[in-house]
Amino acid sequence: MAGNSIGQAFKVTTCGESHGAGLMAIVDGVPSGLPLTSEDLQLDLDRRKPGTSKFATQRREPDEVEIISGVFEGKTTGTSIGLLIRNTNQKSKDYSDIKDTFRPGHADYTYSMKYGFRDYRGGGRSSARETAMRVAAGAIAKKYLKQRLGIEIHGHVVLMGNEAAAVTDPNQIDWQFVNSNPFFCADPDALPRFEALIERLRKEGTSCGAKLEVIASGVPVGLGEPVFDRLDADIAHAMMSINAVKGVEIGDGMRVAEQFGHIARDELTPDGFTANHSGGILGGISSGQDIKVSIALKPTSSITTPGKSIDQQGQPVDMLTKGRHDPCVGVRATPIAEAMLAIVLLDHYLRHRGQNADVTQPVAPIA
């Protein structure tokens, strides 16, 4: 099964299924000498893991990560880093009655048609459980980016269903507050509305989508490879690989269709750019401004409202999904999106350093 790796100079390969023995990752390209412990990775894993909030799935997994290679005496050696998380709270019997049917909105049908066989337990490889390893690998990237380059990456929820948080200037966001509440939301006034929405969804047996914003600050100018490996193209690819993501915007995104050129262009002055409509990327290369990415996630397909589907014989069936599921996947998607942005940025930084370390820039960076 191809498509399990991302990156070139910094490469992450994952494996494992939702109800298998565990999840694993191989992380290649981490420079030597980076102080690293499992606790560094656990901080982000604890932000993503299930069972930590009444507003998310109640499957309880400790998600304790083990570093099994690539680190010696607390520092990276420059060799492949092996990561392992063991599954401990599988309830495969919740899925025994759907092994011969296809859940609408899930990958059951497409996996079966592509491979002729599938692991029906919790979605197998298509489950969002796989993203735990992305978060672990992304934590390595985040630490390197922050410690060596001063790059910081933060995400927050801006929309859940029909409830929106107040749009806030990233420079004014209290990130400590964002990370202390279960919705990763920067707007205190939105929290009661988000809570009420989740409770209503549970009572009605349905779910809702969400929109998140992820921001990388301190990114140097010059990251990105024209033309097919543009930085924004690789970011979009990484974000679209996250389960349930159906839309990605860089900067103003779709709103640029309504703008005029004299407003949308990010003009340059000796003191910096006058705007950042492009989200910190021009011509596929980072401009030195904050990189701003928004993603839209569809509603969870596993809901208790009955729906129509077919079985493996092509016969119509009525579906009622059992198991432990998120009323809104956006609640736990923020650290996943942060991880994917970190993976892409570190990959492009290492590629840029390898090719252009000796380049003399004609002017001082203005961002």
UniProtKB/Swiss-Prot annotation:
SUPFAM superfamilies in UniProt: Chorismate synthase, AroC
InterPro entries: Chorismate_synth, Chorismate_synth_AroC_sf, Chorismate_synthase_CS
Highest taxon, organism lineage: Bacteria
Catalytic activity, as annotated: 5-O-(1-carboxyvinyl)-3-phosphoshikimate = chorismate + phosphate
UniProt entry keywords in alphabetical sequence: Amino-acid biosynthesis, Aromatic amino acid biosynthesis, FAD, Flavoprotein, FMN, Lyase, NADP
GO MF term list: chorismate synthase activity; FMN binding
Pfam family, one: Chorismate_synt
Ranges in coiled-coil conformation: none
CDD domains from the UniProt entry: Chorismate_synthase (cd07304)
Cofactor binding remark: Reduced FMN (FMNH(2)).
Cofactor: FMNH2
Chain sites annotated for binding FMN: 125-127, 243-244, 283, 298-302, 324
Binding, NADP(+): 48
Associated pathway: Metabolic intermediate biosynthesis; chorismate biosynthesis; chorismate from D-erythrose 4-phosphate and phosphoenolpyruvate: step 7/7
EC number: 4.2.3.5
GO biological process: amino acid biosynthetic process; aromatic amino acid family biosynthetic process; chorismate biosynthetic process
GO CC terms of this entry: cytosol
NCBIfam families the record matches: aroC, PRK05382.1
Function summary: This reaction introduces a second double bond into the aromatic ring system.
Family, as annotated: Belongs to the chorismate synthase family.
Quaternary data: Homotetramer.
HAMAP family assigned: Chorismate_synth
Protein name as catalogued: Chorismate synthase
Organism: Psychrobacter sp. (strain PRwf-1)
Annotated gene: aroC
